[in-house]
Amino acid sequence: MIELKEPPKIDLEQLQKDSSGYKKTIQEVKQAALNPGFFCLENISEEQADLFAKTKKQMDAFFSLGSDDPIKLDIDTTDSDNSYGWMPMFQEPAYEAGTLAHLESFDFGRRKKSVEKPSYKPNRWPKIKSFREDIRNIWDAYTNIGMLTLDALNEAFIFPNEFLKNNCDTQDLSTMRLLNYPKADSSLINKNNVGISAHTDFECITLISQTSPG
């Protein structure tokens, strides 16, 4: 188990190739990627911070709805062949035997998926004012941050020019998840009833934004 007082921190502005601290920051990215294997991106722009605030507001509006609310039920993924939409509490797979995931989620993918490949299902959006627009805007912003991060990793490990970016540019398998971990009664909290158990993701990288520690 990795124990850190705080994660390595990378200045997002210094990942721009014309920044004064670019070479030094690339070495910091390499070191963090090797050990512990993750890092925290700092110094996001005011525009990105504003988009995050709007996203948080939309998430609060959606996840505050009851599980029997028509807005949620209309896009419920339970017993559906479409994984895009609202996943109710305890539907998340148990990634470790004997655990129960204490969360609900809203999942969606890129529009081009269902247009270019019929095997992909279309997105389903909750009927909440500006929800779709605000959430898509934050995903576009995070996509730009992701590509910048891929460029940094590419440079750090001396891959062929834009190798990582070129292998991630279609985003066919890219998915954004809005996750809600409701506060649990202290009597229910134990090693088996977890927010989400330890697991690995299948993407090249995963960007995580949290509203609280944990």
Please provide the spans of the model-predicted regions.
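Peripheral, non-catalytic segments flanking oxidoreductase cores
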Residues: 1-214
